[in-house]
Amino acid sequence: MPIHPLNTTNHIRSTYLRYLRTIKPFQNEWYRQAFADAVDESDLLVKGPILEIALPYEKEQSIKDLVEEGVLSKEFANLQSPDLPYTRPMYVHQVRAIRKAVSGRNLVVATGTGSGKTETFLVPILNYLFREQENGTLSQPGVRAMLLYPMNALANDQMKRLRRLLENCKDITFGRYIGETDRSNDRDEAIRNFQKVYPKEKILDNELFSRKEI
């Protein structure tokens, strides 16, 4: 959906400054107003907008194409998730990265923001799990993949996507290990604690909620 860069910048600026004015609740009215004025008048807190025109990334094959070619597992057809469209063409760098990863090559992906870096490692990981499922080895215990993020917010965002993707993949277990991961040894208790924090989230049978489970 197109956005107006100036209106969006003004909205972000006003929201951010409003937040800053509330983080220091001075009891004295004079200090409170002086702090608010300093926040509003500063030209160091918000810059921009800084606009950049970027050409669209070149597209190539879809996941469906790679499945039919034999590069990826046929199990991808069963995902049926808008988070990983089966028939939508992927970017060239995504297809190249997937091919290299599936063939056992190491790689580094450097590309622009919003250009689908996640798919370059997530698709090969899912393919590896699906291949194990096909070979009957997925039930054997062990961690197959670890996704490392520098901040909880990034880990939480990825977790939301994984929950949507793997909701119907009952044989694939997954979990999130961060500071707030439940320390309980009891799964039911861990789920209750999870629901207190995320009351709207659906509980998945293949999700691991406690540190002991993970």
Regions found by a protein language model. Give the residues of each.
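Helicase-associated low-complexity/disordered flanking segments
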Residues: M1-R96, N168, I172-G175, I191-Y198
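Short, well-ordered loop/turn elements at secondary-structure boundaries
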Residues: L84, V102-G104, S115, P141-G142, ...
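Walker A/P-loop NTP-binding motif
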Residues: R99-L107, E119-Q140, R161-R163
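Short hydrophobic/aromatic beta-strand immediately N-terminal to the Walker A/P-loop
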Residues: L107-A110, M146-L147
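The conserved Walker
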Residues: T111-S115, M151
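Conserved Walker A/P-loop ATP-binding site and its immediately adjacent core
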Residues: E119, P141-E167, R176-N185
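Conserved catalytic network of the ASCE P-loop NTPase/AAA+ motor domain
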Residues: E134-P141, E167-K170, E207-F209
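Inter-Walker segment of RecA-like/P-loop motor cores
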Residues: K170-I214
